[in-house]
């Protein structure tokens, strides 16, 4: 049996938070300078607001649908579940359906919320909804190189080997495996 440890924790809350305005804005994000004043110091944050994001993990006959996309920081192809920004006045599940169709040519339906989370709690706003379903049909003729159906076992192997690097995809696969 484990003994519960007593922690002497000091948590610093800022006395004042000042938003200094938008330092950058484009179609996909805005960056705001924020100054947090504590008792003995100040801390400057540059908070990037990407807006909310929706994703869908499709599992049909034990295989997961992954899109294949070039990613600059990898300078390579990344295997990812279909995901993207939620447009203004768009519901998260509708955004996930749209993104899946845009990225893979598959139309999915009967989505259920698997998990929602915030990937960063300090410098990035990007509330994320991950849905799951077993219902999808191909309605757009896409190049087969744009997507892949991969078994859950092989997805887990790809994560362990560093072949799947996208955090949203890793969270989605592990959540599907362990929470559902």
Named regions from a protein language model:
Residues 1-12, 77, 88, 122, ...:
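Nudix hydrolase/Nudix homology domain
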Residues 18-55, 60:
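Acidic, metal-coordinating catalytic segment for phosphate/diphosphate chemistry
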Residues 22, 115-120:
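Short, solvent-exposed loop/turn elements at beta->coil junctions and helix N-caps
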Residues 30-40, 120-139, 148:
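Active-site-adjacent beta-strand/loop module that shapes the phosphate/pyrophosphate-binding cleft
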Residues 39, 60-63, 70, 133-138, ...:
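Short loop segments at secondary-structure junctions
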Residues 50, 54-98, 138-142:
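Conserved Nudix-box catalytic region and its N-terminal flanking loop in Nudix hydrolases
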Residues 65, 80, 112, 130-132:
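Conserved beta-strand segments that form the floor/walls of ligand-binding pockets within enzyme
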Residues 107-115:
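A short coil-to-beta-strand element that immediately follows conserved catalytic motifs
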